[in-house]
Amino acid sequence: PVFEAIKFFERGGVNIAVIGQHFPYTPISNPKYMVEGWSFGIRPEVIQKNINKAKKKGAEVVVLLSHNGFDVDQKLALTLQDLDVILTGHTHDAIPEAININNTLLLSSGSHGKYIGRIDLDIKKGKVVDYASKLIPIFSDVINPDPEMTEHINKLRQPYEQECNRVLGKADTLLYRRGNFNGTWDDVICDAIMIERDTE
């Protein structure tokens, strides 16, 4: 593995293991030179070994932080044992409340920072006995930016500021991108491809 598969945390007196699961289709969704020599896959048997290892090391709660996608992780939940939570991504689904599949809670928090997913677990004797979950909408115009993070971003951006501010063209309408749904920005890109390739 390139990265450690398991990280341990203690919250509220409970030992929590978080297992990472990378996007399994990386080799077919990215140029080969970017992932040369690496292999990717869903690999439920490897995830199960990591769950077992986490439990042996004293984890009371095991969380899978996954980029498989909501549909894949629903199927995965049916095959794994002793997995408490899957925080799933990639498919950008915004699920209002966690769903329970095979005693594994799945939560998907949308995309592009529109929501923060929150799940509260009631743990008794190393078992999840109850839970509450929700999506918290993020309204960027009412949240004050973190000054330290703003300074860090500005510092990273500074060498490229002139290039980032170069005008490439002007639009008569607002260009936006929604994430799950098409927006005007998507239309511009698709129209440009069709014009360039002379397609319908």
Regions found by a protein language model. Give the residues of each.
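Acidic, metal/ion-coordinating pockets
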Residues: 1-158, 180-192
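Flexible, glycine/charged-enriched surface loops at secondary-structure junctions
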Residues: 62-65, 162-170, 200
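Residues that form generic nucleotide/phosphate-binding pockets
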Residues: 152-159, 163, 174, 196
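Glycine-rich phosphate/diphosphate-binding loops and the adjacent beta-loop-alpha structural elements
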Residues: 163-184
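Glycine-rich, aromatic-lined ligand/substrate-binding cores of catalytic
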Residues: 192, 196-200
